[in-house]
Amino acid sequence: MADSQSGSNVFSLRIVSIDYYMASPIPGYNICYSSFQGSEVNEVPVIRIYGSTPAGQKTCLHIHRALPYLYIPCSEIPLEHHKGVDGSTLALSLELEKALKLKGNAASKRQHIHDCEIVRAKKFYGYHSTEEAFVKIYLSYHPPDVARAASLLLAGAVLGKSLQPYESHIPFILQFLVDYNLYGMGHVHISKMKFRSPVPHHFRPRRFDLDDCPGQRIDEVAITKANSSAAASVSFPVWSLSTIPGQWMWNLSEESDTPLSQSQHRHQHHYRRQSLCELEGDATSSDILNQQFKMYNSLSQAQSDTNMVQSLVAIWEEEYERTGVHDAPIPPDPGKPSAADVLQTMSDYVGFGNMLKEMLNKVELSPPGMKPTAVSSAGPDMHAKPEITDLQALNHMVGTCSEFPASEQLSPLGEKSEEASMENDEYMKTPTDRDTPAQIQDAEALGLFKWFASSQAAEDINSDDEILRETILSPLLPLASINKVLEMASTDYVSQSQKECQDILDSQENLPDFGSSTKRALPSNPDSQNLRTSSDKQSLEIEVASDVPDSSTSNGASENSFRRYRKSDLHTSEVMEYKNRSFSKSNKPSNSVWGPLPFTLTKNLQKDFDSTNASDKLGLTKISSYPMNEMTDNYIVPVKEHQADVCNTIDRNVLAGCSLRDLMRKKRLCHGESPVSQHMKSRKVRDSRHGEKNECTLRCEAKKQGPALSAEFSEFVCGDTPNLSPIDSGNCECNISTESSELHSVDRCSAKETASQNSDEVLRNLSSTTVPFGKDPQTVESGTLVSSNIHVGIEIDSVQKSGREQESTANETDETGRLICLTLSKKPPSLDCLSAGLQDSAHSHEIHAREKQHDEYEGNSNDIPFFPLEDNKEEKKHFFQGTSLGIPLHHLNDGSNLYLLTPAFSPPSVDSVLQWISNDKGDSNIDSEKQPLRDNHNDRGASFTDLASASNVVSVSEHVEQHNNLFVNSESNAYTESEIDLKPKGTFLNLNLQASVSQELSQISGPDGKSGPTPLSQMGFRDPASMGAGQQLTILSIEVHAESRGDLRPDPRFDSVNVIALVVQNDDSFVAEVFVLLFSPDSIDQRNVDGLSGCKLSVFLEERQLFRYFIETLCKWDPDVLLGWDIQGGSIGFLAERAAQLGIRFLNNISRTPSPTTTNNSDNKRKLGNNLLPDPLVANPAQVEEVVIEDEWGRTHASGVHVGGRIVLNAWRLIRGEVKLNMYTIEAVSEAVLRQKVPSIPYKVLTEWFSSGPAGARYRCIEYVIRRANLNLEIMSQLDMINRTSELARVFGIDFFSVLSRGSQYRVESMLLRLAHTQNYLAISPGNQQVASQPAMECVPLVMEPESAFYDDPVIVLDFQSLYPSMIIAYNLCFSTCLGKLAHLKMNTLGVSSYSLDLDVLQDLNQILQTPNSVMYVPPEVRRGILPRLLEEILSTRIMVKKAMKKLTPSEAVLHRIFNARQLALKLIANVTYGYTAAGFSGRMPCAELADSIVQCGRSTLEKAISFVNANDNWNARVVYGDTDSMFVLLKGRTVKEAFVVGQEIASAITEMNPHPVTLKMEKVYHPCFLLTKKRYVGYSYESPNQREPIFDAKGIETVRRDTCEAVAKTMEQSLRLFFEQKNISKVKSYLYRQWKRILSGRVSLQDFIFAKEVRLGTYSTRDSSLLPPAAIVATKSMKADPRTEPRYAERVPYVVIHGEPGARLVDMVVDPLVLLDVDTPYRLNDLYYINKQIIPALQRVFGLVGADLNQWFLEMPRLTRSSLGQRPLNSKNSHKTRIDYFYLSKHCILCGEVVQESAQLCNRCLQNKSAAAATIVWKTSKLEREMQHLATICRHCGGGDWVVQSGVKCNSLACSVFYERRKVQKELRGLSSIATESELYPKCMAEWF
């Protein structure tokens, strides 16, 4: 085997599905012995992760050594058991073990407790100033034991006292994800693992086929995929027998020649494969690298722009990659009042102060023994250390730093903001670590960090200084070594402190040489051979970052020390990064920050730099290309080390007089200085003695050398310089400065003063002239991250220097340090300059397709070399946002900045140039404007998703605009390579015609000509994880057709499966493969005799053979997601039920981990021949469904079908939460989502089609099933369910299926615990009794009863943005900051738990915030809450997303929809955070006091705003309604525009009254409107003063509700529109008269009168069936005829109300709509019920406010009743005999309705004019026949017609309006044509044919 995979030793796997199982431990690999039990371990939990590697290899990963646990406070253990650490923990554990055994099976030998230890942490529930000791008990072996143990502890079954458990309510899987920093749909990175045999010999790309032919063999070590987001090709490792390291394989393969030991033989079964995945392996929890990169910064020190919630950083980076601009959070307004001041106006602070003083006085006067004190943190003999995340965490915190280059260990040096620099000039002169080089700072920070780790536990453990306590949840050292460790820590503390002080003093002297500093700061590099390889290939990379200290680096524990990567950094090249142990800055987007520097290395480089210690001589940092330029390679700037003098501004006498501790504090303060992110302010540190600035200059001079471009360094100031590749740079001068890293501006708005044309050319050609086009980017990137990455900052310095400052000599250069800054000699233009340049006219100098296109931009390109000029002014405005002086600026989360320097235009590829030249041979005078050259970078996946908006295809868009403004739909080109468009203009017509044809077929209204066509499918969007390479998900859609008997639905007990349609698709592909498995026992020919196209067909003679083949095929494809519309009834559920009848273990066989009895480990294939099939599993057929549906919750809320390792999605139930519809049939959803009409064919017809054979209509049945399988994928893609759910999984940190199946508390808890654990908090786990017995919640939100009326004056709607989250942030409301109520403090309770507060904390009233409900909290200056910080980041992310939405163009409708979904998800998680605190019934950690505080603060804020508005005479406004977070303000006598002005004033004034971030926003203006009752209002809304057409906006009324029918909603909306526009109630009355007459005469569509309501059978009372809801009654009636028609839980069942007997109840008058639509139906729609009980009451609630009486209107209306069905001619008699007209002897005239004799058809009056009567009958019959034929044609075109024309249309879709019209016309035609035929006036017309 290969020793390594391209040097990589990291295995990465995407977490798609995760579960755990119990197994016996693997010797030497798992926990095999328990010291607590004193015996071997029998079973341990093993976590199983399913997913794909970045290369797409399906993998099953077993994680060992992860155990469930819980915590118990040591303070709650009874005192008699305090016999030291060992005694107390042992007694507790033994008692708990005994209780668990007694609770279970006493005779069982099952083990429960594995180990216990003492840890130290803070309680999260309530304010606790000190840490406490906890017993951490590992309940090994069975995770459900944790819940049982918690119940026993709370019940007092252990030690005879109720003990409060902590974190026992967290599920085992979530506990694992949180502890090891893992996220669903993110990657887990493993440092080492063991693969289980067999492994694939070669990598074969996954392909979907039904044969056994092997795929194409690929021998490469890595596969390359195009990444369209980074526009670069990314190489992913492939794991096969030839690439897996030998030590990474279990030595148990049959192919191995190594003899096995006896132990290995005995445990050989442990290493056998369990899964069917391509790869399978084992790893331990300690091998997970993700856990090492948590960020442990204290919240009190983290800046607002530092993302502590790591899952949100990816959203910020994606936006930066898309726009190139980093949108920093908006800082709070310093002029706004403080939280304490606002709370004083809400609360009775005088009474509160008196009560508090009285209580404190009583405490002081009480006897010493009675004085309440804080709960002791530990017993007298207990010694504990701060807890960290695992046993080696202390080593991780220090040791891991030594594994990586020093430049990656220490924090990136941030930059001070302009404001901060101006406000505090002295800070610029303060002696800080900015004056020292990075290597000295590295050593200082590392030493300081070691001092914290060693000394803090012994000395500062009880301090409340959050700067000192950064250590996080971890087990402690054994007791025997505690004293020794403390002694060593004390010694280390003294030595480290002395070394720190010496370093501080040394920093004021001359810097040591580079070699010595390197040896001290950098560890030995184990990968030096990789460095040598990279230097040989001349592909060393350098990485640029800022060099200014950041606030997050306080305590020396820099952010970069912990967070070396994130998933977004690793998703393209994570293996390469891990391989070299060089992790990029956490907040720096990978491959998208820097443009290439114009330098290359030649072979002479090796002469000056030895490859073995190149890292000691070169400061090299990686530079990645900007997305538009990533096809270029990376460049190196070699700089030799020289010594430099550093400013010495510290008085040595002052330093000498400081104590050791003072020096350390000074050191910490220097690190923790409040650095705000700096935009573009220069920071030049000058020598205080000489006032000079040390600066080194790197000057490049370019010379023309014939036609070729060349350049050379004419002056290289660093002495020995390698020969560099020549570069044409004109007069480009690059200043390299040590201290200056700012952009200086000197106005140069004249084009003549800017860079010359040659220098402009250089800037454009930097990325194309130094590296050949054909160079393999993979070669350049391989092995380059090994080098020591020294962060340098790039500066654009164009200050016009004079004298010594402008001249840079070699002597000055020799004194500079190793940290350098690259500076361009010519500054970019300012914004003013750019604006002026945009107005200049274009001047063409030469034919240059990338440079001179007047259609692309205006102005002189030499004026602005950094940016292309666009015509779109709006785009220019957006492009310059967040930039300073024209340079894109990226604000990192740590406060530092990155400057984005890219060429103005990306160069074309070689193929593009060659094709351009070849096409240009015919005409040498082609105008470049008419022949635009498009980029064709195949190697970087460049593409343009919108050709109409692409500036370099203007000739196309201009021509298209001339033809009906139709734009070119380029969605098909979005993921293909671009082409050069050099066709003559005549060809554009064809392109235009194709676009118009595609729009006609899209069934979507065409664009208005102002924007491109909106893509119909969401497949045009891919989220960051699936960009280019995809998320490696395989989705399989399954639909089934089975036989049916008569009108019954298929029953798996009796009916065989005939057709299985399989549609499989990878998420990175737009092409779905279709396969059909056909059971046809009569088929002799196995060929595709049905003539099906676009699919692969397999025919089977036996049903068992069909199932066997289906199982084999599914296991070969190994899909991640199984999808079906109705899983339980028509997809996998039906197959499982049928397989159970056949004796096949279907669900077990299709799982990824089947039972060993059905898996052949030798070839990993299923062997399910008929001889291996066991007897039927179910003896009683009635129990079949119970076998398939495993749990009740799954049946009612998900699919109910569980397949191990695969996600089963019930499509209709997912859509139910996405789209609001009356019915959720696939036909209704397809029309609403896809705008496609889909036929609904009854099972009886499908069976007839299939039975007709290949010569008949069997193909119609097969196509119908295939279409439904395809629709599943299309609907999911249209709604982007897979990608959106994946994104939510990454944000929430939970697995994919939990996003869909778990509630909001689970989501909040995942995000909350991750942040809480970084601050050393433990969450309480209350029991059900505790939750029920907590104090009742007293506060309710303010919901005013509105002044119900019609308002003809403007009504302003003002809304507090995210009111409850804003309250939490503004007033620091959190579990960890809550001090409780004074009244409750006497009872020592807080929420669900007991709480004793140290009253010394209450001494200072200024340090306490009291909310209006008298609950006390500490201000953020004392402690920053977890909830406020979490919500602050969520809201800032949402604001950023909403801003991005506003900047999108109309053609980016798909992206707009995704952004909208993203911001709604963030809004949801922010709003439900309050619900997490207030979940009083099923809450996992509720707190009544906290919930009441949030509600009452919000209520008080709203009440205060209402009073303020009503009391302000200037506005003359009055609040007429208020609801939780909004208020409606009436402005009498104002116009809409005036209302907007007043509304903005109100919003601004109230916003200024409240602390940050409470914001009142003006939403809209209603004019006019109705206010009905609470939460019910409707009106015409205006969202801007310039809006002309109002929007009909309603809430809570029938127009938006689904508990009524469409007739009510349509009638009400039209009536309201008439009244709003006409202001005349008579118009409404006339309209209603017309509608009522239509209803009474029957001239309506039945579709508008269908009710559809949810049915939950099994939840209703069984005492009286008449008490069931109408929909349930209809369902039960249907089930009596066919039990398989049982509706799914919460399925919406349609019904209509018909006429019944006199006095009949409503439950007796409801029927299925299909019953009423039947041609021979005896029923008639109950028109009076709909008018009197539905339409009139709804409208009366509205128009009653203006004095209308609709009941009186209806009574006064001339009553026109239609003739009964008995008076209408029918072809057949009333066979049902359910009406009295069956017994009538008389009939009615078919023309006038008069009574006639039984044998006559016409009355005497009509017979007097026979010709007129005959003409009338013929005309009516002909008209109906034409209508019927037209409707039937529509239905046949849709696919609803029968294969025999005479059989008519078989579709009966209730979602189709054509179906209702067709049935209505069919009834009329049937009766009239029979009479016309009998009268011999018209030929016979068969209505059944239609």
Swiss-Prot record:
Q: Where are the zinc fingers (CysA-type)?
A: 1789-1806
Disruption outcome: No visible phenotype under normal growth conditions, but mutant plants are hypersensitive to UV-B light and gamma rays.
Where, in this chain's numbering, is [4Fe-4S] cluster bound? C1835, C1838, C1851, C1856
> GO terms for molecular function, please?
4 iron, 4 sulfur cluster binding; DNA binding; DNA-directed DNA polymerase activity; nucleotide binding; zinc ion binding
Which EC numbers does the record give?
Answer: 2.7.7.7
InterPro entries, alphabetized = DNA-dir_DNA_pol_B, DNA-dir_DNA_pol_B_CS, DNA-dir_DNA_pol_B_exonuc, DNA-dir_DNA_pol_B_multi_dom, DNA/RNA_pol_sf, DNA_pol_B_thumb, DNA_pol_palm_dom_sf, DPOD/Z_N
Gene Ontology cellular component?
A: nucleus; zeta DNA polymerase complex
Q: Which cofactor does it need?
A: [4Fe-4S] cluster
Reactions this protein catalyses: DNA(n) + a 2'-deoxyribonucleoside 5'-triphosphate = DNA(n+1) + diphosphate
Concerning Gene3D superfamilies, the annotation shows: DNA polymerase family B, C-terminal domain, DNA Polymerase, chain B, domain 1, Helix hairpin bin, Palm domain of DNA polymerase, Ribonuclease H-like superfamily/Ribonuclease H
Keyword annotations:
4Fe-4S, DNA damage, DNA repair, DNA replication, DNA-binding, DNA-directed DNA polymerase, Iron, Iron-sulfur, Metal-binding, Nucleotidyltransferase, Nucleus, Transferase, Zinc, Zinc-finger
Q: Indicate the principal place this protein occupies in or around the cell.
A: nucleus
Residues that coordinate or bind Zn(2+) = C1789, C1792, C1803, C1806
Q: Where is the signal peptide?
A: none
Instruction: State the span of motif (CysB motif).
Output: 1835-1856
According to the record, cofactor stoichiometry and binding are noted as: Binds 1 [4Fe-4S] cluster.
Write out the biased-composition intervals (Basic and acidic residues): 922-940
What's the superkingdom here?
Eukaryota
Instruction: Note the PANTHER family from the entry.
Output: DNA POLYMERASE ZETA CATALYTIC SUBUNIT (PTHR45812:SF1)
- Subunit structure of this chain's protein: Forms DNA polymerase zeta with REV7.
Q: What is known of its domains?
A: The CysB motif binds 1 4Fe-4S cluster and is required for the formation of polymerase complexes.
Described function: Catalytic subunit of the error prone DNA polymerase zeta. Involved in damage-tolerance mechanisms through translesion DNA synthesis.
Q: Under which name does UniProt file this protein? A: DNA polymerase zeta catalytic subunit
